[in-house]
Amino acid sequence: MRTFDGLLIEDKKVRQKNLKHSVEFLICEIIENYYRWSDSIKMRNGDDCDYRDVQADEFKNGITYKVNNKYIKIYTVDKWGQRSVWGFVIRENDTVLCTHGLNGGNHFSRGDLLRARSWNQAETKYSVGNILKCTMDNLTKPNPDYPDYKTVWSGAR
């Protein structure tokens, strides 16, 4: 039996499973980057080592994802219940339109990683990589270390 896009049902299930595994791997990488950032802060100022360890554990336990129609939203929940979006992953090809002036009319690919504009909205000007292809296409973008937290989390002291 085939789906409306011509794929065998088994193929579609495998594709969804691969995307889920890629998102879970990305979350592990985000956690690892957060721990590296936390360790670099502890080296700079060793006064709050215990608090940084607790903070890193809370981050690890609070990061999760939610599957929506077009996106997979990756977000964190802190111990007070406050939530913040880390980013979005495109679920299927040709469902999200690129809004950049030079690329207008093109669609994002399945697995493309987008930054968050707000809680429910992704930044659709460009992708910062693709989790299925293991690429980070952001060398010329404003934040070249993304998703490395040494830049993203530089505001904490």
Q: What positions do the PLM features span?
A:
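Short, non-transmembrane alpha-helical segments in secretory-pathway proteins
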Residues: 11-55
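Short, flexible coil/linker elements and helix-boundary hinge sites characteristic
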Residues: 34, 42-46, 61-62, 94, ...
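Amphipathic, interaction-prone secondary-structure segments
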Residues: 51-107
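A short, surface-exposed interaction/processing loop segment used at functional sites
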Residues: 100-139
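C-terminal partner/receptor-binding element of secreted or periplasmic proteins
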Residues: 132-157
